[in-house]
């Protein structure tokens, strides 16, 4: 009887240990590095914890948006682990200096009626002359 109690206690501890160690699924993250960049210098955009499910596409659309303009950076494929990386260089004459937002958008569908639901994340990027 005592042996059964010890075995159950150890099994409970193991279950609890794995439950604590398992990563929690959270919202998608977007990061931009560096946050301040000069024209004609490289910028790296990274995403993590983006959904990889049947209702979402695997391609994220990346844009630069300011108060007056919007510029398509390109697209990046979400890997099986929910991450993506894209590098770009803001070119002189195409993008002006100032405060911009890097916008990542992933198209998903509603599981009920198939209507589009977009997952959008934004990060500020300061472009210097």
Task: Enumerate the predicted regions with their spans.
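Extracytoplasmic/secretory-pathway segments with low complexity and glycosylation-like composition
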Residues: 2-4, 12-16, 21-129
């Amino acid at each position: 009887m005592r042996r059964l109690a010890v075995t159950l206690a150890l099994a409970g501890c193991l279950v609890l240990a794995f439950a604590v160690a398992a990563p929690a699924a959270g919202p998608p993250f977007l990061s931009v590095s560096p946050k301040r960049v000069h024209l004609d210098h490289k910028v790296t955009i990274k995403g993590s914890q983006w959904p990889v499910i049947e209702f979402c596409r695997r391609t994220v659309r990346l844009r630069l948006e300011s108060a007056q303009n919007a510029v398509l950076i390109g697209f990046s494929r979400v890997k099986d682990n929910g991450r993506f990386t894209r590098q770009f260089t803001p070119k002189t004459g195409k993008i002006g200096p100032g405060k911009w937002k890097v916008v990542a958008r992933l198209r998903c569908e509603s599981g009920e009626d198939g209507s589009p639901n977009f997952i959008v994340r934004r990060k500020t990027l300061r472009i210097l002359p």
